[in-house]
Amino acid sequence: YRGEPHRVAPIAVLQDIEYIDDSKGTNVGATVAAINSVGADRRIVLILGGDGKDQDFSSLRLPIQQYVRSLVLIGKDAAELRQVLQGAGVPMHDAASLEDAVKLCRSLAQTGDAVLLSPACASFDMFKNYVHRGEVFAQAVQTLAQDLGIELDHLGGVQT
């Protein structure tokens, strides 16, 4: 069984770091579920942010404390996320674009980690929709693979 696109979907493994697209994680509940699932057996570098639509982000704090190595914040509500999550004790970094976020995640992740795009926010501040956001993420992972000299047969394929 292959999962639905953009719903905790593995994109690639590059140098023992797995890149996972959960662009459909457009609200806090979905992102909490993704963090708990992916974090069950490894640490996460999490890309979070976008248009939060006035959600309460505080329920992200505990799973982030438990499973997340670093946060990379993007989009309109990055500052609000930073304010709510600053007590979580997890390093936070800002990225101007999703492409920059993927590059930054590569430098923050350690062997065996996952880089997870699960933004807990709508995409409309930077993208047409969550599908577009997921496609930009996948393309950024493809570009990273090329920069590392790694040939990916197809996205969704696992290469090391």
Model-identified regions with their sequence ranges:
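Glycine- and other small-residue-rich loops at beta-strand/loop junctions that grip anionic moieties
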Residues: 22-23, 49-50, 74, 93, ...
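Short beta-strands and strand-loop turn motifs
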Residues: 116-120
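Acidic, Mg2+-coordinating active-site environments of NTP-dependent enzymes
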Residues: 1-19, 82-85, 138, 148-153, ...
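C-terminal helical cap/extension that packs against the catalytic core
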Residues: 58-113, 152-160
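Nucleotide phosphate-binding/pyrophosphate-handling subdomain across enzymes
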Residues: 1-67
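A short acidic, helix-capping loop that chelates divalent metal ions and anchors anionic groups
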Residues: 17-18, 123-127
